[in-house]
Design a protein with these regions (language model features):
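Alpha-helical scaffold/interaction cores of sigma-54-like transcription cofactors
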Residues: 1-274
Length: 274
């Protein structure tokens, strides 16, 4: 941590960051300043809701502007953090992605506070939906139940499915391979072929949408009524969410803001109140 600093260092850094914002804004023909102003207001509302707010997350902490407008609580120059290309760069003309943390127990309170404020100035805020799909193993289990195949057989088949970096191979990769990257799993293929129709049924089930949820952090914030930009639907808990998932909804011209929750902030707050 640097104890000494000079004003020119801060001005030069800020000039570089503002130049980057203007350059990208010109390239996409949209004022990126709106994003930073809105994000700053959301952080203010988190504090107003009585929640602690995380000091920073990810590469957003390397931007001096974020610190100056209270999005983050870390001085990147004092901490000797360079303004990195990962956060935003003219070669990638798009909006940055700032993640802000609040207390997990205050998630609903924070969301309602944000929604109340933006509704009051003629805007709208809505949670983003997520679609859960049948994975490789769950597709096999669903198909096995439908064909009345012994559960031990299905468990044996699922045990042969490789997992790379947290992701299971697809059924197609297990059965057919994937060019030069993945060879078919001979034992898997021989075992699944013993049960007529299992491979075809499981392969058709894999990837189907089977459940609806709420995005862990994403909210859509718009001017005017959200219905002008998309449509609503309800989760099983009667919560209003977007009818499209994040990527499809962004294609409709809206922008997602990330408000995450961290249980550690709850515990810190409890200690401070003790």
């Amino acid at each position: 941590y640097k104890d000494e600093w000079d004003i020119d260092t801060y001005f030069n850094r800020l000039e570089e960051e503002l130049w980057t914002i203007k350059t990208i804004s010109d390239n996409i023909n949209q004022p990126m300043s709106d994003y930073f102003i809105t994000m700053s207001k959301m952080v203010d509302l988190m504090w107003d809701a009585g929640s602690l707010v995380g000091p920073s997350r990810g590469s957003a902490g390397a931007m001096l502007l974020n610190y100056l407008i209270d999005i983050t609580q870390m001085d990147p120059i004092a901490l000797d953090l360079p303004f990195v290309w990962r956060f935003m760069h003219p070669s990638r003309p798009d909006y940055p992605d700032i993640d802000v943390d609040s207390e997990s127990d205050k998630r609903a309170l924070v969301f309602n506070k944000v929604k109340e404020y933006f509704n009051g100035i003629g805007g709208d805020v809505v949670n983003v939906c997520t679609f859960g799909t049948e994975g490789t193993k769950s597709a096999l289990k669903t198909a096995g139940r439908g064909l009345n195949i012994d559960e031990d057989v299905i468990n044996y088949l699922t045990s042969m499915i490789p997992n790379e970096r947290g992701f299971d191979w697809s059924l197609s990769d297990c059965y057919n391979g994937n060019g030069e990257d993945r060879a078919p799993i001979k034992a898997f293929k021989e075992e699944i072929d013993k049960h007529k129709g299992l491979w075809a049924l499981a392969n058709n089930i894999e990837g189907l949408v089977t459940r609806l949820g709420v995005h862990a952090s994403g909210v859509i914030c718009v001017n005017g009524d959200f219905i002008e930009h998309g449509s609503y639907m309800k989760t099983t808990k009667e919560q209003l969410v977007t009818a499209f998932d994040l990527h499809d909804q962004e294609e409709c011209g809206v922008l997602k803001y990330d408000m995450l929750t961290v249980s550690a902030l709850d515990r810190i707050h409890q200690c401070l109140n003790y």
